[in-house]
Design a protein with these regions (language model features):
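Interfacial loop/helix-cap signal at membrane boundaries in integral membrane proteins
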Residues: 1-48
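Membrane-spanning helices that line or support transport/gating and their immediate boundary helices
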Residues: 87-91, 111, 121-125, 168-175, ...
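Generic hydrophobic transmembrane alpha-helix motif, especially the helices
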Residues: 94-97, 102-107, 111-114, 124-161
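Glycine-rich helix-loop "coupling/hinge" segments at transmembrane-helix boundaries
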Residues: 144, 218-259, 271-281
């Protein structure tokens, strides 16, 4: 006697039921994501390439100094010289939207979990499973619900990027010194003031690590999502793989490295700048 456990036997009816009863909700989610993603991509592609390079370099100079400005300019010029400018901008837009939503979901839950041990205990096995599941698996339900295109890629990337950000947010707020919080209560500070003036600045170093992990995992997922029609550099990697064109795959891979370095440095700079300003105030 053999046992055949097939998740598809019950998963397919569930997906059909969701598509039938929540089609309007999924269509609205798709429309919102497409609008935000399309607007950001259009904003990146509207000015000439040299203008984007100058803006990124100026922003990096203001946040981190001249070394970061040179790094940002070199990374973007490298993408342009590889003849992958449009694809690089599309990938930056995909990752930016995905990371922004992942952070918006993970940070509040992480703060709440740091204050509620039972919630943290309940979330721990869920996060363990989410971080153990191969990234390809996230694309399957997303494609089944949202069909092919950029939207399922964004949804899968958001889900894939939430666990590291949530874990490190919880850790960051648990590591805040209790005497600082007690001092805030002693001087009569409101809970909101304690959160934004004491806890958040103290948690910034660990939050930077979480954001870095979220960006890198999101970038990896966006590249894999080229298989489902997400576009960007992931589509070029997929094209190089299917056609056995090593040059195309290598060019796209190098552009991905440049984009990853750019996003990592800029995100770190923004958070660290906020940390310094909060400490001064």
């Amino acid at each position: 006697m053999t046992f055949d456990l097939s998740p598809g036997a019950w998963l397919a009816p569930v997906v059909d039921w969701l598509n039938t009863n929540f089609h309007g909700l999924f269509a609205a989610i798709s429309a919102v994501i497409e609008a935000v993603l399309g607007g950001l991509q259009a904003a990146l592609l509207f000015p000439p390439a040299y203008a984007v390079v100058l803006i990124a370099a100026a922003l990096a100079w203001a946040l981190l100094g001249w070394r970061a400005a040179i790094l940002a300019a070199v990374a973007l010029c490298f993408c342009y010289l590889l003849a992958l400018w449009d694809e690089s901008m599309e990938t930056i837009a995909l990752v930016s939207v995905s990371v922004a939503i992942s952070v918006a979901v993970a940070v509040p839950i992480g703060i709440l979990a740091a204050r509620r041990p039972r919630l943290e205990a309940a979330l721990r096995p869920v996060l363990d499973v989410m971080q153990t599941v191969p990234p390809w698996v996230y694309l399957i339900p997303a494609v089944m619900i949202f069909s092919l295109g950029r939207v399922p890629a964004i949804i899968a990337t958001i889900v894939y990027g939430i666990p590291p950000m949530l874990r490190l947010t919880t850790l960051a707020f648990k590591q805040v010194r209790r005497d600082l919080i007690e001092l805030g209560h002693a001087i009569g500070a409101a809970p909101r003031t304690i959160l934004f003036k004491i806890e958040v600045p103290s948690a910034i170093p660990t939050l930077v690590v979480g954001l870095n992990q979220c960006i890198l995992l999101s970038l990896a997922m966006v590249v894999l999502a080229g298989l489902v029609g997400a576009g960007g550099l992931g589509a070029e990697v997929t094209r190089g793989l299917t056609r056995m064109e090593m040059g195309l795959g290598l060019r796209a891979g190098l552009a991905i490295v440049a984009v990853a370095i750019l996003l990592d440095r800029m995100s770190r700079a923004v958070l660290q700048r906020g940390h310094v300003q909060a400490a001064r105030s």
